[in-house]
């Protein structure tokens, strides 16, 4: 990220859900992706810097977020993204509650939470969670799913419905238990037990600083694609 010139990237999807490809309109098959590389256009996309690490489209902690790196590879190949749901339900039925404080330029949010998302892409886990967003606007969207410090059974059931609304209806859903922020710089305070997921891989734990790096990824995208 310190280079004077921005290297050019062609993208061939090889993952389970291929969220970046979905966001950019790149076909999931190799032949289609290669055609984009040969005939497409260049767009400078934003990415995120988290302390000294980087992520393209998602930084997350809490419910279901460990499923992407704990799901056995054989299970992924067998049932695809359904494997994430199976693994998530198996390991996260109770949804651990954790305290998080997020300080942005214009707002501060602090609460007990079951899920925190920093989103730069339109898709998360194969779902159009943030489909109205842009990967070229210099900002990211943050969603915090709040929970009581000591939730009872009904509170936990309620969390399932809130999470379902968020993933099915998207970031713009009106829900009082989902706090939302937007910006380009966030300082995040969380306990060391809070593990952050960077683009589907296990990342850092605890306190992090999340910054948007505008236009740092020079990606070849479909020539007719206009919305990034």
Task: List the model feature ranges, each with a label.
Residues 2-117:
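Catalytic core of DAGKc-family lipid kinases
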Residues 18, 123-124, 194:
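Glycine-rich nucleotide phosphate-binding loop and flanking beta-alpha elements
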Residues 75-83, 128, 132-154:
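Gly/Ser/Thr-rich active-site loops/lids in small-molecule metabolic enzymes
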Residues 51-52, 137, 214:
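Residue-level signal for tight coil/turn positions that link beta-strands
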Residues 60, 64, 117-131, 202:
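Glycine-rich phosphate/pyrophosphate-binding beta-alpha loops
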Residues 104-106, 110, 134, 144-228:
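ATP/nucleoside-binding phosphotransfer catalytic cores, i.e., glycine-rich phosphate-binding loops
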Residues 65-67, 110-111, 124-127, 150-154:
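Short acidic/glycine-rich loop or secondary-structure boundary segments that cap or lie
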Residues 50, 70, 119, 143-145, ...:
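Short beta-strand-to-turn element immediately C-terminal to the catalytic PLP-Schiff-base lysine
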């Amino acid at each position: 990220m310190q280079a004077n010139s921005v290297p050019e990237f062609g993208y061939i999807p090889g993952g389970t859900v291929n969220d970046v490809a979905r966001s950019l309109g790149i076909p999931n098959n190799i032949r289609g992706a290669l055609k984009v590389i040969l005939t497409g256009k260049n767009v400078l996309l934003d990415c995120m810097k988290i302390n000294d690490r980087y992520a393209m489209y998602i930084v997350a902690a809490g419910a279901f977020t460990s499923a992407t790196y704990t799901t056995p590879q054989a299970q992924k190949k067998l049932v695809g993204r359904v494997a994430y749901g199976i693994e998530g339900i198996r390991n996260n039925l109770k949804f651990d509650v954790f305290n998080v404080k997020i300080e942005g330029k214009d707002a501060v949010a602090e609460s007990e939470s079951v899920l925190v998302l920093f989103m730069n892409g339109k898709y998360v886990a194969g779902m159009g969670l943030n489909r109205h967003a842009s990967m070229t606007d210099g900002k990211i969207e943050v969603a915090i799913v709040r929970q009581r410090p000591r939730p009872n059974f009904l509170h936990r059931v309620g969390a399932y419905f809130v999470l379902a609304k968020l993933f099915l209806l998207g970031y713009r859903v009106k829900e009082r238990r989902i706090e939302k922020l937007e910006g380009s710089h966030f300082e995040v305070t969380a306990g060391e037990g809070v593990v952050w997921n960077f683009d589907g891989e296990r990342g850092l734990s605890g306190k992090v600083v999340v910054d948007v790096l505008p236009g740092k990824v020079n990606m070849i995208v479909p020539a007719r694609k206009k919305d990034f």
